Amino acid sequence: MLRFWQEKLPLLPQELREVLEKTITHNLWRKYETINLIASENAMSPLALAAYVSDMMHRYAEGKPFKRYYQGTRYVDEIEHRVMQLMGELLGGAHVDPRPVSGTTANASAFRALTNCGDKAVVAPVQAGAHVSHTKFGTLGGLCIEHIEMPYDPENMNIDVDKAIRLIEEVRPRLVVLGGSVYLFPHPVKEIADTAHSVGAKLVYDAAHVLGLIVGRRWRNPLDHGADVMTASTHKTFPGPQGGIVATRSEELYKTISRVVFPVFVSNHHLHRLPALAVTAVEMKYFGEQYADQVVRNAKALAEALAAEGFKVLGEHLGYTKSHQVLVDVRAQGGGAKAATLLEKANIIVNKNLLPYDPPDAIKDPSGLRLGVQEMTRYGMKEDNMKDIARFMRRVLIDGEDPEKVAREVKEYRKEYLEVKYCFDVNPLEDGRLYLLL
């Protein structure tokens, strides 16, 4: 396939060559040469990728399956209906709307459906991992919902349950939000849900980062513990196409939120996501528990290995992590911005991140790194590989080795881990071309 591009590219206009060359270079670099530890990313299987690249990316299907405002959607309707069934089964009998095109769109739909402008929302604090869409600067604020943070318990690296309960009873909000984008341990859903319901509030749990762990039964299903609504992304620990879902076990809430998804926040919902999401849902049905178990074991192994190599890893007294994430304080190595930049030069991709004790204005150069092991787990890495990754990181950030030298070793190391695991052994991708569905 590379030879094909080498022969054809010179025949194209310069501006087009530049775009295609950068796309090819990106694909080769990120997919085949780097160790990706971004906690919000993953890799679809070849079969899901083949299903993703379909004619559906050109089509519209506003509305609900079998009740569209467009013709020509008979097969889209059947696939979307199957997605709703599959995801509902994986989540223990939930009503699922797969039309949000992102986790934030899912959040916006749930927040808008359950509140009015001027209502109060009590949310998990930034220290406990709240996503930007939960804040006054993000979606909540944009919907003119008053944002009130729960107290944080630094010892347990979680919400302070007793103080949060008292706050909810005092404030009597319309909405309570748990979950987020940076958290190592499950939020206390049942305790908070009971209090929320006692004051007439609804609880929304943002499971964007942990959907794959929930489906794989390695993270509590918030719907089992009192959450009224769960929102999620379909492309983090759940290794599907980029997109979002809203799930609830209340048919009434499902109908209310669905009427907000369309037409308030979504018109067409990027239909080519649906076949790929269906493929991934079936993969998770058959392989999800193995995958989620290995993700959690790898995260713990990486945390322990990094600590052994001399890094300050958060949460040691709590066992480091129960999720796919690891948090590392790299102030001694120059701070999060410097560390992330050096690691990228070494072909190790991470993101700088605020740690619980960082002030909000440190966002451009925070104390920490947020690491996620889900994608490398998907490529077959296990506990011993986490030790190797920790050694690579130590050589760059503690020993001060030339990152370009380490990058060459990382590139060679990745050659053994290029095949997606925890999926069906069907590869419709041959030499870069799709032979199954096109």
UniProtKB/Swiss-Prot annotation:
Residue(s) at site: Plays an important role in substrate specificity: 235
Required co-factors: pyridoxal 5'-phosphate
Principal EC category: transferase
UniProt KW Amino-acid biosynthesis keyword: yes
Protein EC: 2.1.2.-
Cellular-component GO terms for this entry: cytoplasm
InterPro entries to which the protein is assigned, alphabetical: PyrdxlP-dep_Trfase (IPR015424), PyrdxlP-dep_Trfase_major (IPR015421), PyrdxlP-dep_Trfase_small (IPR015422), Ser_HO-MeTrfase (IPR001085), Ser_HO-MeTrfase-like (IPR049943), Ser_HO-MeTrfase_PLP_BS (IPR019798), SHMT-like_dom (IPR039429)
Alphabetic keyword roster: Amino-acid biosynthesis, Cytoplasm, One-carbon metabolism, Pyridoxal phosphate, Transferase
Gene Ontology terms describing biological process: glycine biosynthetic process from serine; tetrahydrofolate interconversion
Positions bearing N6-(pyridoxal phosphate)lysine: 236
UniProt-annotated binding residues for (6S)-5,6,7,8-tetrahydrofolate: 130-132, 252
GO molecular function terms noted in the UniProt entry: glycine hydroxymethyltransferase activity; pyridoxal phosphate binding
Subcellular location: Cytoplasm
A Pfam family of this chain: SHMT
Pathway assigned in UniProt: Amino-acid biosynthesis; glycine biosynthesis; glycine from L-serine: step 1/1
Role description: Catalyzes the reversible interconversion of serine and glycine with a modified folate serving as the one-carbon carrier. Also exhibits a pteridine-independent aldolase activity toward beta-hydroxyamino acids, producing glycine and aldehydes, via a retro-aldol mechanism.
Family to which this protein belongs: Belongs to the SHMT family.
Subunit structure: Homodimer.
Full protein name: Serine hydroxymethyltransferase
